[in-house]
Amino acid sequence: RGGVFLWPRVFTLDTYKNLLGQKIWVNAFIVSFIRTIVGTFLTVCMTCLVSYTLSRKELMFGKIYRFLVVFAMYVSGGLIPYYIVLKNLHLINTFWVYVIPSMLNLFFIIVGMNFFGSIPTALIESAKLDGASELRVLIKIVMPISTPFIATLALFSAVNQWNSWLDSSYYVNTEALRTVAYRMLVE
């Protein structure tokens, strides 16, 4: 009988065998996997560095920088100027067009600024009194207590990297660099 069923009538892996038998899909999985790992790692590193720096009250012109981050998030530059910038940086049709532009997500930076701004300044000042540099404070004190933020950031970034099809559609013409999300969209 016809109809919609909650469970499959017959369990089979034939579709996966068919899919993984096609080189184009295997390559798309490899590109997506590498993009997700590299992009997530670099996004977490850059976001932590930038958002920690911008969250510090003693940063010279800090209010201006924070305003520019929020302003840039609300006012986008547009697709054509963005494409021209990527072309001038020679990122079109390269793997790095996936990773480099996504390293600094302004939403992630704003969330990070709020998180790092909530860390008590007495904790940071006591480390500086003991002779710790800014980098040592960040690595030895701030990062260990920031694991909830880092885990959330890594999860959001990984999902964003894996599901992104737009950049593969606009900035990549080479079939070998297409991602799974793009393949699922066009096929």
Per-range role (PLM):
Residues 1-187:
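A hydrophobic, multi-pass inner-membrane permease signature
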